[in-house]
A protein has these predicted regions:
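Short, conserved catalytic-motif segment at the N-terminal edge
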Residues: 6-70, 90, 106-113, 118, ...
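Short, surface-exposed beta-strand/loop micro-motifs that present aromatic residues
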Residues: 357, 364-373
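Active-site SXXK
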Residues: 16-23, 43, 69-100, 195-203, ...
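Short, well-ordered beta-strand elements
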Residues: 368-369, 375-384
């Protein structure tokens, strides 16, 4: 990719620190196998790099068309898809979820205890679609999140709920109807399976299979041919290996492309974390977000709807006041949450730059942010689980914003 940092308003020598930083701090000491980075401002690619390897055992260098597991970077895509139906008048954010999933009318709230001795009560108010999009619905991740054990998590396992094992999105949603909520909807924030339910709502409301809706309404208009829920055989050689660290902090294989579950199309595609994508494809999604819903002259979602989605929906609170447990794809201080995106409300409180940006990330150390005020977005792709291993977001943001020149000489 041709880059022009000067035209994009960056000092080239300063922005090149990003390459040096990632190479010397992470690639050379083998803390990660490889990564890709793209920085774009004012519609101009300012920085693009493919570093290290996509597969250590097979000695494959990171390539421009490498396919990544983007995990929770699926969530903003699913949220945009659902809000497309909102724009068609198919639902209101304040609609109770049971309007579309009748069995969810019976949800109860956890009070105390566990298993057969668990005490529950009726909710003070029904769960709405807005609650699902904001992760304030009272759902959890059923014990999946590292270091976070919640009292209702065991009920997910007892109900046979699995992020990967559902037969269909419908059976997944029906099983969730039998699990007590952690709190009254709208009163707290907890990272959860809620966006998987949003994917099912896309299916119910549109009358189309979820994956088909994404393909027709987003991936085709956005020219994202490599984004999907499984890897075709003809693209297998482009699929990156995924890694984790052993007890000695050495890289070890977590998911081999040759034997990966992604080789088989899922029967219940996860709207919360199931997509594979490339840097090119996801950059088109970010182009659309930065251009206020427009891509290649076509308005996919309105500016007003996108502004609603990226606004803080936690009232006057931040994640620091609302979150149950500490897990998130970001720090909680000074950060709000909207309809599928986090947003920096207070840069001083969050200890970062980019106030007013919106963003999210994925389990395998992928991340993006969009900053409308600076007309900028950034994407980072690696394949190291979990994403909390290194603070790539903070480091990359510091270098990127520290490289803005505004016409001065570096």
């Amino acid at each position: 990719m041709i880059t022009d940092p000067t035209a994009a308003g960056f000092c080239p020598e300063k922005l090149e620190r990003l390459n040096t930083h990632l190479q010397e701090r992470y690639i050379t000491p083998k803390k990660i196998a490889g990564c890709q980075v793209l920085i774009k401002r004012k519609g101009i690619a300012a920085f693009s790099a493919s570093l290290g390897q996509m597969d250590i055992a097979r000695q494959k260098p990171m390539a421009a068309d490498t396919l990544f597991r983007i995990y929770s970077m699926t969530k903003p895509i699913t949220s945009i898809a659902l809000m497309m139906l909102f724009e068609e008048g198919r639902f209101q954010l304040t609609d109770p979820v049971y309007k579309f999933i009748p069995s969810w009318r019976s949800h109860r709230i956890w009070v105390e205890g566990e298993g057969a001795s668990m005490i529950t009560r009726a909710p003070q108010s029904p769960m709405t679609i807005q609650h699902l999009l904001c992760h304030t619905a009272g759902l959890t991740y059923g014990g999946f999140l590292p270091g976070l054990e919640l009292p209702v998590d065991a009920a997910y396992g007892a109900a046979g709920i699995s992020r990967r094992g559902a037969d269909t999105l419908e059976t997944f949603a029906e099983k969730l109807a039998n699990v007590p909520l952690l709190y009254d909807p709208g009163t707290r924030w907890s990272y959860s399976m809620a966006t998987d339910v949003c994917g099912y709502l896309v299916e119910v409301i549109s009358g189309q299979p979820f994956a088909q809706f994404l393909q027709e309404r987003l991936f085709e208009p956005l020219d994202m041919p490599d984004t999907g829920f499984s890897i075709p055989d003809e693209k297998l050689d482009r699929f990156a290996a995924c890694y984790e660290r052993d007890r000695n902090k050495e890289l070890k294989l977590q998911d081999d492309p040759e034997t990966s579950r992604y080789r088989n199309p899922p029967t219940a595609p996860s709207g919360a974390g199931g997509l594979l994508s490339t840097m090119r494809d996801y950059s088109h999604f970010c182009d659309m977000l930065l251009q206020r819903g427009v891509f290649n002259g076509k308005q996919l979602i309105s500016r007003a709807t996108l502004e609603l989605m990226t606004r803080n929906h936690l009232g006057q609170s931040s994640l620091a006041q609302m979150a149950v447990g500490g897990f998130s794809e970001t720090s909680n201080e000074g950060v709000g949450f909207g309809l599928g995106f986090a947003s920096t409300m207070d840069a001083a409180a969050s200890g970062t730059v980019g106030e007013g940006d919106f963003y999210w990330g994925g389990l395998a150390s992928t991340l993006f942010w969009v900053d409308p005020a600076e007309d900028l977005y950034a994407i980072f792709m690696a394949q190291l689980i979990p994403s909390s291993t290194f603070n790539f977001r903070g480091q990359i943001k510091n270098i990127v914003y520290g490289s803005l020149c505004e016409g001065a000489q570096s």
